[in-house]
């Protein structure tokens, strides 16, 4: 299950960022995942819930935005949506092979919210 290792990676990043910003409890995490990453959002959500037990993010709400796959043609210089069921992306205008994938490979924590403990 690739999603479980991704969940552990996200939790490692959350732990680091929480310590850096004085956050003791993460309540919400928003993740951006590119369509080309072949991650199943529901499986990642389950993996995150399981892996987060006993961590700063235990019980946190995970929301996932899937970023569309887009390519850029170096001949026409246009951006276009690409099909994710193929490994070669063709320009819809000239038929050329897309020289660059400009979105769809993202895997990032876009934001997280949490609270910090205060001592009296």
Where in the sequence are the language-model features?
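Cys/His-enriched microdomains
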Residues: 71, 89, 107
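Cys/His-rich microdomains that often coordinate metals
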Residues: 79-80, 98
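Long, charged N-terminal interaction/targeting segments
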Residues: 1-63
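Long, charge-rich boundary regions
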Residues: 2-4, 105-120
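Short cysteine-rich clusters marking metal-coordination/redox-active sites
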Residues: 73-76, 91-94
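Short Cys/His-rich "knuckle" micro-motifs
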Residues: 83-86, 101-105
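Short loop/turn motifs enriched for small/polar and acidic residues
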Residues: 32-36, 65-69, 110-112
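Short, flexible, mixed-charge glycine/proline-rich loop motifs
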Residues: 61-68, 80-85
């Amino acid at each position: 299950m690739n999603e479980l290792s991704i969940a552990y990676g996200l939790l490692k990043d959350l732990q680091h960022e929480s310590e850096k910003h004085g956050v003791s409890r993460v309540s919400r995490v928003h993740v951006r995942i590119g369509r080309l990453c072949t991650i199943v959002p529901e499986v990642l959500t389950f993996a995150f819930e399981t892996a987060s037990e006993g961590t700063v993010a235990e019980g946190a709400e995970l929301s996932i935005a899937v970023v569309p796959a887009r390519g850029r043609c170096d001949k026409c210089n246009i951006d276009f949506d690409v099909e994710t069921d193929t490994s070669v992306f063709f320009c819809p205008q000239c038929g050329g092979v897309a020289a660059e994938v400009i979105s769809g490979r993202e895997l990032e924590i876009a934001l997280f919210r949490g609270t910090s403990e205060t001592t009296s």
